[in-house]
């Protein structure tokens, strides 16, 4: 490919609204262009990278016997009503009506659609197991699209689904996908961490996330030297033992005025107590009405755990208006004492040992102190609701957990019979009895992989692409292509090298400085410079990851160039510059 013919509009500066290094560099390097919040066009360089990521994923899917299909983006609402997820999935689902007033969605995922297809085809146990995948655009109406390709409204994803007659077969497929995802990470060259994960709106019995490590990642990951690792949404907390309750004698319940204080710390300072002696009351609205969740004042509530325990993905925190309208009190003073019996009260286990604690007074400007469980209010259900943080004891060994950040690229689920039972997906076994399919699903973010690689592999000059997905392997920079000898050698090298490598020939009439800066910005692994040293019979080779140049003589032909190129590309390792701990 000749640079003079390549549509790669590079920029000196990134747009002011680009919030991560990856999207700044991808825009500056001419890989993508933003069309709207969370919506991007892939230009030729970006599409080359995207296609290479796709190819790696396809090869790993083929290696485990997963067959490729292509499903429609538009899905009828009826399928989602069958599964019960039309309302449960949440506001991220893009819904619309056609001209006949029929409801449809732009698919955020395809469990329902594929189940509706195979339930009419897979009837006998002899047809199992079966694994199918597609690579296609997905759509989610993110409330705040951000981080470039990482949190977009339209994105490219590989989603696979497996169908089984027994759990042993699902376990094998799950392990196959687990290993395949590890190989994808390794082939791309990413540093990564696999963690136990929350199943969220997808549902199921077991789930793992594959995260590319990045300080700018959205995912918070907790891990321990013993091998335990989980997302903060999933990480269990080693609760205080019921055998160590607060030994204080019960005090009288007292409603005290707390003028002008709302936050936990303000209440603690005013009442001269610690945040641990305050219980926060968080009100949520769900399918079955209001739910009050109680958590200690020094802790944060894990909404994912709350949704999972209550089996309600529609739970959202009640608004100021809803609290005032239904309970007649501002949100900062809501509490469990005297709460309406119709409101379900759930609490984190760490609240159970407390005695004489502080809660909202159900009256503006007031709090209760001296509150005791059982005497002053009752809890309907106890759960682990705490958002685990760095330093919390590991649930497996008790040692303090460590924390890192990551970008979720892969997510695998054991769905079990959640969809097959609801959508009448049954097979007949060898005894003629009917059973629901046992399913798994396995997602991989193709487009966000681009951003994850750039987040890990870049420097102050630009991107540093791994060889496996680089838009080109080599760029030949002709310093002054109008000079006959430079042009001749550059063209000869281009014709020779493109037989084995993907080569970009920079034949533009531009200054050497512009060409060198563009080569670094675009991040091509190896640069060959044909310039002023040609008068001495020399050309210069430089890896994107290194500062030093390698001079190679071409006085006796190009054999030494071929040998040096092969040697340099073998040692090329952008992971060494990955900006992660």
Swiss-Prot record:
Top EC class for this record: ligase
Q: Which GO terms describe its biological process?
A: prolyl-tRNA aminoacylation
Query: CDD domains given for it?
Result: ProRS-INS, ProRS_anticodon_short, ProRS_core_prok
Q: What is its EC number?
A: 6.1.1.15
What is one GO cellular-component annotation here?
A: cytosol
* Main localization (coarse): cytoplasm
Recorded catalytic reaction(s): these are: tRNA(Pro) + L-proline + ATP = L-prolyl-tRNA(Pro) + AMP + diphosphate
- What keywords are assigned to this protein? Aminoacyl-tRNA synthetase, ATP-binding, Cytoplasm, Ligase, Nucleotide-binding, Protein biosynthesis
The family line of this record is:
Belongs to the class-II aminoacyl-tRNA synthetase family. ProS type 1 subfamily.
Instruction: Give the multimer and partner information.
Output: Homodimer.
Q: Which PANTHER family match?
A: MITOCHONDRIAL RIBOSOME PROTEIN L39/PROLYL-TRNA LIGASE FAMILY MEMBER (PTHR42753), PROLINE--TRNA LIGASE (PTHR42753:SF2)
> What job does the chain carry out?
Catalyzes the attachment of proline to tRNA(Pro) in a two-step reaction: proline is first activated by ATP to form Pro-AMP and then transferred to the acceptor end of tRNA(Pro). As ProRS can inadvertently accommodate and process non-cognate amino acids such as alanine and cysteine, to avoid such errors it has two additional distinct editing activities against alanine. One activity is designated as 'pretransfer' editing and involves the tRNA(Pro)-independent hydrolysis of activated Ala-AMP.
Per the record, what about its domains? Consists of three domains: the N-terminal catalytic domain, the editing domain and the C-terminal anticodon-binding domain.
Q: What is this protein called?
A: Proline--tRNA ligase
Q: Which species does this protein come from? A: Kosmotoga olearia (strain ATCC BAA-1733 / DSM 21960 / TBF 19.5.1)
Provide the organism lineage as a comma list. Answer: Bacteria, Thermotogati, Thermotogota, Thermotogae, Kosmotogales
